Amino acid sequence: MSKRFEIKPSLKLQCLGFMIGSMFFAVGSFGPISAAIGSDASNVLFFIGSWGFTGAAFIQLQLSGPTRNERGALRAVWLAASTQFVGTILFNVSTGSAIYAHSINAKQDLVWAPDAEGSVLFLLSGAFALLALARVGRLWKPRDRDWVSNWVNMAGCVAFGISAVAAVVTSNGGVENASLAAWTTCIGAVCFFAASAVVLPEADDSTASAEI
């Protein structure tokens, strides 16, 4: 009888997923590369990268543990994972739509709107992750890998939020500030890559504390 192949969710896989997704976003939004390959190719890279994010976020949600702690309160770790997972799905919609959306309405409703909503959810996710640190007294632990990871991740969320604001679709079908949108997307992607890379050396199969 053949042995069943099974991939077990782990922090290492989560980190690798976010790092792979971040690489695609960083390459697609990096000015010289984006100019060389064109917007269509960049959009394809974003779409591929968004699925790296979604896969990693799904693993994170699985590892986050129960929704509530023993006192019945919603756990910050679960809130961070769940909001991020939904945000990545919205990025799937946005980046996928960007490949074929040509009308102004399509760009506004199918590309920018889910991008903005996903960015808001990423900001909430980053805030919940910091709340989880605060609940265990680690909100200021600069030498701690988790502290570094969470704050760098929050910086990435802020960068993605700025990108969404800069990418508002104008009346002629362009974006408000294409250069700012691209560079903050690239910065955010680099932050997300670094946030995962910093904890990868110590990644194991453990889940978060059920209390936070």
Where are these regions (language model features)?
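Hydrophobic alpha-helical segments
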Residues: 158-161, 168, 190-193, 197-200
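Juxtamembrane membrane-water interface segments of multi-pass membrane proteins
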Residues: 1-10, 31-37, 59-78, 97-108, ...
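Physicochemical signature of membrane-embedded alpha-helices that form the seven-helix bundle of GPCRs
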Residues: 13-20, 41-52, 76-86, 107-124, ...
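The feature marks the first
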Residues: 5-54, 61
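Alpha-helical transmembrane segments and their immediate juxtamembrane boundary regions
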Residues: 28, 56, 91-94
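Hydrophobic alpha-helical transmembrane segments in multi-pass integral membrane proteins
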Residues: 87-96, 155-170
